[in-house]
Amino acid sequence: MSVRILVVDDDRAVRESLRRSLSFNGYSVELAHDGVEALDMIASDRPDALVLDVMMPRLDGLEVCRQLRSTGDDLPILVLTARDSVSERVAGLDAGADDYLPKPFALEELLARMRALLRRTKPEDAAESMAMRFSDLTLDPVTREVNRGQRRISLTRTEFALLEMLIANPRRVLTRSRILEEVWGFDFPTSGNALEVYVGYLRRKTEADGEPRLIHTVRGVGYVLRETPP
């Protein structure tokens, strides 16, 4: 059964972007547009984690945190906010948030922080079973280890995020814009060849010993992870 995450933000574009990204990565996602709706949804069907904006109408994110913690609820909470001062971060943590992420942010970082929050609430053996595999390629989001067969591959943060997205969606064609949004974040570049450059890096590293290519170009669309060319 997939992990259920409740995303609470009054900005519809942010809600939908997070829904797409989290769903793409195997989470079951529900949406709320303010704190009152969020508390009602949590009371009726408690999720596994909460992604919570601070500035919202009716009931803001900090008050949601306070109300949950006052009842003894230890639901993992990741707070999002456009304010990034020390005092704002302290206020969020003091209200009961487990982690704090300022906007704008890279979706890659939000996913990493969510994995870290969930690891804290799961037994050790559950965390150890998160390795992702395709063909002879293995990626572990917990240890951040990547292997092609028995060969260890060292990746940068961006290379890892790109490969993680591909391996989470085997044989599914991912559009260029979708990859840019998820790996580079909301302020992703609309021009330039950053994506092509990083795909080239990944290919060189995953094919360094002459292994067959797994990352293929779908001309005019994007990229796909599969055993044979599309």
Swiss-Prot record:
Residues 129-227 bind DNA. It holds the Pfam family Trans_reg_C. Its main location: cytoplasm. It is found in: Cytoplasm. The modification 4-aspartylphosphate is found at D48. One of its GO terms (molecular function) is transcription cis-regulatory region binding. Phosphorylated and dephosphorylated by MprB. Induction: Autoregulated. Induced by low concentrations of sodium dodecyl sulfate (SDS). In strain BCG / Pasteur, induced during growth in macrophages. It comes from the Bacteria. Keywords: Activator, Cytoplasm, DNA-binding, Phosphoprotein, Repressor, Stress response, Transcription, Transcription regulation, Two-component regulatory system, Virulence. The keyword Coiled coil does not apply. This is Response regulator MprA. It comes from Mycobacterium bovis (strain ATCC BAA-935 / AF2122/97). The gene is mprA.
